[in-house]
Amino acid sequence: MNLKNVALFAGFFFATLAIFVQGILPMLEPESRQLKITKVVRTDLGELKWMEHEATDYSESELIGRQVYIREGCWYCHSQYVRPVTGERRRWGPVTQAGEYAFDMPHLFSTRRIGPDLSRVGLKYSDEWHLAHFWDPRMVVPDSIMPRFAELFDGPHQGVKVVEDDEGNRTLDKTADTGNIFDYSSQEKIMLTPNAEGLVFVSEKGKYPVIWTPNDEFTGDTVNVIAQTEELEGLVDYIQKLGTNRGKWRDLFEPQSIDASMVSIPRSEEWIAFGKEVYTRRCEGCHGDNGNGNGPAATFMYEFRPRNFTAGVFKFRLTPSGSLPQDGDLWRTVTRGIRGSSMPSWHMLPDKDRIAVIQYIKYELAVDRSDPAEPY
């Protein structure tokens, strides 16, 4: 047997071995067919406990999203496996169990983490955050190296004129493109708030468009329109499914467990200066460079707009109405986020970053400067 035949045989053997080990053997393992997982549930007494349950299958929309995830190569950079080694549990959440992958064929463990692990990302961020992230990751993570996935959107349809309708509403000019997105005869309206650059995201087609800018978020006369698609919606649904088979594990996640009542931070110019850097890197994409709640990503956040810090109004606080929150209130919000809104948890930031950004928000953005003698 000559060397050429040996090489050919070896190549065929190892290719077959790889298919068997990575494709066939996992299906033969009993663990690959078990649905049992442990998840955190809240009992009738309000207690959080780990209990044994069965994993649930993907919905039709989630399966569409999973195919998009595979097609677009998301698994090249993102793993879906929390390893049983030091630091993984604290960084990502509970260690992976076999039952979580019972409906995954093929599995998407991946082997590299160029981007973060996604096995516990479900419900960490809002749907709107993910939409902004897919359109342009730098909107919400300025130092991200993730590519844009603008092709998943319908659009952009550029230079659409803002006009006034018969009822005095600011709406969008009817063109061939906008006619495919909106129903100009519909009685059901969709409120659209462009960002400062004039980008408008349409979350639901078939409604009558109304430009809604209560705080003069946008004063231009043309906008660029992008809209939701079935593949984009499915991809977001799939991402939000990841990790949810483990129940309310976030409520027991140690890094988010805090005693905010003990937090008190003296005012410091040094902290404020550093806080501005943190704000620019982590918060500006949603809340805007001046804290008015209209950052580049804000147009995607159609259900819960980012907080306008300049108004000095904070919903989650222990202080009386009309007053600023305590440092502990802001610490809790920054650390744990606000479930159901576009505000994610920032527990992974160093303490000094969270302290500094609270100082910057409190003493630079959320202050009434109408009296120069008492600017704070």
Show the residue positions of the predicted features.
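Conserved catalytic-core motifs of eukaryotic protein kinase domains, centered on the activation segment
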Residues: N294-A298
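Hydrophobic membrane-insertion alpha-helices, especially the h-region
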Residues: L8-G23
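Extracytoplasmic electron-transfer domains, predominantly the class I c-type cytochrome c fold
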Residues: A55, E62, G87-V236, T299-L349, ...
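N-terminal positive-inside, membrane-proximal cytosolic segments immediately preceding the first
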Residues: M1-L8
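The canonical Cys-X-X-Cys-His
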Residues: G65, R71-Q80, H130, L235, ...
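Alpha-helical transmembrane signal-anchor/signal-peptide segments
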Residues: L28-D44
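Electrostatic cytochrome c docking/interface patches
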Residues: K39-I70, P84-V85, I114-P116, N224, ...
